[in-house]
Amino acid sequence: MVIELIINTPSRLHLTLIDLNGERGRLDGGVGITLNEPELVVGLEASDDMGVEFTSHAEGKLREEYRSKIMEAARRTLKHIGSDEKFHFTVRSMFPAHSGLGSGTQLSLATARLVAEYHGMKFTARELAHIVGRGGTSGIGVASFEDGGFIVDAGHSSREKSDFLPSSASSASPPPVIARYDFPEEWNIIIAIPEIDRSVSGRREVNIFQEYCPLPLRDVERLSHIILMKMMPAILEGDIEAFGESVNEIQGTGFKRIERELQDPLIDRIIDSMISAGAPGAGMSSFGPAVYSVTDEKPGNVAGAVAEIMGPGRIIVTGGRNRGAFMIK
């Protein structure tokens, strides 16, 4: 009998990195939101050969990126557990790579979890991340995979990590989570992913970290104040106006300001359109190009305003997801 295992994992917004100065003895730190949509669904079956197929539509370049990440994560996991099994993976649902929604971490962790489950082995999300080499800068993707929700991570001690590097180039362990709260179910999140060629990954991403860091300590202190004394209380109190204001303030502070400056001017126009349409707050996820806004009423107005100016791309109206990845079967 052929046994198929299937996993569902979320996407995430990465609102900002916190400390790219390091003077206080820690680096990185991050804030993020787990999303209901888009989601990743991947299946696994034992096979005579390793392979990956797709039942969801995707262009060739995206398929190759997914295939490469799946094969690498499977190889590392099999090596870790000492198995020579072979598997056929089926990607049933997917979302764009290098768009700011965290597909790389989710795909690697999903693959590792499937391989481990097949062998009857249980690992935490942090353990899986260590196996497949994810979470070396931001812990938001790993924490989203584990428990979902609104997340703040603590970054890394300078004793473990002394260089300014993105997660894809860092061997550090996933950082501890400082806070994890349920994201208010009544809040809508509107995501816009314009088709622009400004994705940042690989060597270019490493170069950006090396060129712009360390950032001034005053930027880190201001950002920390916004997060601790405005954004986190807003989540706990359900105050969407204060939450939106904190998102807006983050856009011109610290590393987020640099990420925004490196993007296409269309990003600024989309964010402005979201605010003008009534969203209390709007910003860019990670290096983009995904842009997001939050609102508790008339999300269609915000989505419509974006559609008028964005051109080719995708608009998603969704919400926060307060659970992590789960096995469908």
UniProtKB/Swiss-Prot annotation:
Temperature profile: Optimum temperature is 70 degrees Celsius.
Cross-referenced InterPro entries: Beta-RFA-P_synthase, GHMP_kinase_C_dom, GHMP_kinase_N_dom, RFAP_synthase, Ribosomal_Su5_D2-typ_SF, Ribsml_uS5_D2-typ_fold_subgr
Keywords attached to this entry: Glycosyltransferase, Magnesium, Transferase
Catalysed reactions listed for this entry: 5-phospho-alpha-D-ribose 1-diphosphate + 4-hydroxybenzoate + H(+) = 4-(beta-D-ribofuranosyl)phenol 5'-phosphate + CO2 + diphosphate; 4-aminobenzoate + 5-phospho-alpha-D-ribose 1-diphosphate + H(+) = 4-(beta-D-ribofuranosyl)aminobenzene 5'-phosphate + CO2 + diphosphate
Superkingdom field: Archaea
Cofactor(s) for this UniProt protein: Mg(2+)
Pfam families named among the record's database cross-references: GHMP_kinases_C, GHMP_kinases_N
EC number: 2.4.2.54
SUPFAM superfamilies the record matches: Ribosomal protein S5 domain 2-like (SSF54211)
GO molecular function: ATP binding; beta-ribofuranosylaminobenzene 5'-phosphate synthase activity
Pathway the protein acts in: Cofactor biosynthesis; 5,6,7,8-tetrahydromethanopterin biosynthesis
Functional pH dependence: Optimum pH is 7.0.
Main function: Catalyzes the condensation of 4-hydroxybenzoate (HB) with 5-phospho-alpha-D-ribose 1-diphosphate (PRPP) to produce beta-ribofuranosylphenol 5'-phosphate (beta-RFH-P). Also catalyzes the condensation of 4-aminobenzoate (pABA) with PRPP to produce beta-ribofuranosylaminobenzene 5'-phosphate (beta-RFA-P). Only 4-hydroxybenzoate is known to be biosynthesized by methanogenic archaea, but 4-aminobenzoate can be used as substrate by growing methanogens when it is present in the growth medium.
Assembly: Homodimer.
Family in the record: Belongs to the beta-RFA-P synthase family.
Name this polypeptide is given: Beta-ribofuranosylphenol 5'-phosphate synthase
